[in-house]
Amino acid sequence: MTSAMSTAFSGAIVAEAEVLNLVPPSRVGTGICFLDHMIDQLTSHGQVGVTLRCGVVHASPEVTSSSNKRAAPCSPTSYFAPLKDYATGQTARPHDRDIFIAAGTALGAALRRVVEEVASEAEKSQASSYGAAAVFCCPLDEAFAEAVLDLQPLDATRHGRCVVSLEPYGRFAGGPSGRKWIGRYRTEHTPLFWESLTAALGADLTLRRVRGGNAHHVIESAFKSFARAFRAALDCMADGSPHGCASPSAGLAAPAVQPRQPRTSERRRATKETTIEVRVNLDAPWLDADAPKGGGSAWTGEVMTATKLHASVRHTSRVATGITVLDRVLTELARAAGIEMIVRCEGDRYIDDHHSAEDVAITLGQCMHEALGDKAGLARMGCAEGEHGSARVRAVLDLSNRPHFCSDLSLDEEFVGGLAAEGTTGEPAGGGVGSGVAPGEAPAPADVLCGNVLSCEMLFHVFDSLTLEMRSTCHLEALADPGSPGHTLELALAAAEAYGAALSRAIRIDPRRHGTVASSKGTLSK
């Protein structure tokens, strides 16, 4: 493993960077504390060790253009301490702009050396190249950003191309750009950093704010998304397979290593409203051989390829809530996640669907949280798309212990699948698939509406309760919506597939993390 050293200059500022692949970090000191914190996300989420320091060159060098081949300046230089503002006690901040440019340039050049190292190793191993491009989205509470990165653009005109669309930086400030400062970090200089980094990296990068009203969250989400996209693009180069945000055709994420202990949980809950039993096993695919037992067998520890794992997933339902659409949604979620999920519920559906749907989601989320344990060594984040019919949904998931759920799905029908409100036919749009009633059959309205169908408000509540009780953050984003009668069923099943696929990637144990938690804090919130 070779070091990746670079030096860059802008005005009176010099930046020196070293990046090592898959090693612990050293120190980051740009002179702007929030920028230090953001660059540290590359270590936690990109799995690269970053050392970067900036300083003031008291006698400007003869040449001020950046170059990773330049030696450190001979002129006296005052370097900034990590996590300490360079202008403390001063009214002027003369070097802010140059710090963003020099730090971005030096870091980009250092990252380029890592790319060249991985590309060289991939060429030696003759891995069938999938390219060096990836998309990733990282959420942070109400915010999430999208990073689209290509480390080796085929079109030479796109080398160094950078598009940054993160404004407004928060919604609690006047003007169209949002907040001007985060600590002593000037938000207006954010594009300068990314443009300088991308130019030195020779990549093609688009950073886009999808959601977010908190400036800190928006910018941190962007840095995390880039870090994850960078790691995913490196992995594409290394093993010749796709990484990053999973497409609907990507299939399951195969387990990489055996967990230290079984990741299982079981809960039973009985109230005047519902009686529920839930069991989950994160590491045991649904095997056909288990069917006579009525439950899952213990995982043998065999590491399965994605193809073999997908072939072993049992497609028969083990979810019985009494609400047909809810059964379909949870079954699809479990299938896409590649986990074993057993749910049984007897509820007061003679009232409506509320108590059964809510209590199932709460209990399932609690089981998932318990099975995940301390989350040490997990990938932690997952991004995936799902589709059903003409609907396409993206799920962005973080097992962060920071509960938050957000969705823009257009759930504009009273019942999932568009059941006729008057119950005259009992048939939802699309042939009766939503209610469990055969097409053309005309039961009394009460038979249809009282608890046998899932209302759209409870579909939202199911995803919300599951996410919060799992102590995770999840965003659902509608990428395509037919909008035709009954479209809410297509959205529901596409969302379930996306959620499950994102979950399968988030719960995957990454041996490169050596049992550590993927967080710049070193731990997750309790």
Question: Across the structure, where does each feature detected by a protein language model lie?
Answer:
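Structural preference for solvent-exposed beta-strand-turn elements
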Residues: 2-64, 68-70, 74-526
